[in-house]
UniProtKB/Swiss-Prot annotation:
Name used for this protein in its record: Small ribosomal subunit protein uS10m
Signal peptide: none
Species for this entry: Homo sapiens (Human)
Gene Ontology biological process terms from the UniProt entry: mitochondrial translation
Membership in a protein family: Belongs to the universal ribosomal protein uS10 family.
Origin: domain of life: Eukaryota
GN (gene name): MRPS10
Pfam families in UniProt: Ribosomal_S10 (PF00338)
Cross-referenced InterPro entries: Ribosomal_uS10_dom, Ribosomal_uS10_dom_sf, Ribosomal_uS10m
Amino acid sequence: MAARTAFGAVCRRLWQGLGNFSVNTSKGNTAKNGGLLLSTNMKWVQFSNLHVDVPKDLTKPVVTISDEPDILYKRLSVLVKGHDKAVLDSYEYFAVLAAKELGISIKVHEPPRKIERFTLLQSVHIYKKHRVQYEMRTLYRCLELEHLTGSTADVYLEYIQRNLPEGVAMEVTKTQLEQLPEHIKEPIWETLSEEKEESKS
């Protein structure tokens, strides 16, 4: 992005030196002069089959600020389950890498696997001694994220859920931090003792 901006500035200076560069600053207007197209939002420059897009206002903030306070999470537990160990290992690596890029502290542990066995007849019309045993192994990975804001948690969860592989399920448990309500802030026994003193006097 910085290289593109610098290159656009060099091209602009070059054209200003040549003298065939005109700028129209009125809003909503678009001027086309000598292979040059200027718009209020983006500048599109063409010079000898070279195209460069340069944003006009780089200082405007992209993030919107709201008065509403963000949700705080003490813990975010993501349980991932699947049948293939290699897929879970790969997904764990991806999720940890994404968390580190966002600056989130993450811990990973592996709960014990669950094995379900089904004993069935080999065929519907066959003797009882001819049986087959099927086994279904479910492997787990638990990702523990701590001390998150609501917006960070939403971005991270959306990113890892969009890249969830086939045959893998996910459960998310959120532990939210809340303020104590006004009616519980003071202990009840203090208010009861004050009422008894008032009634005695």
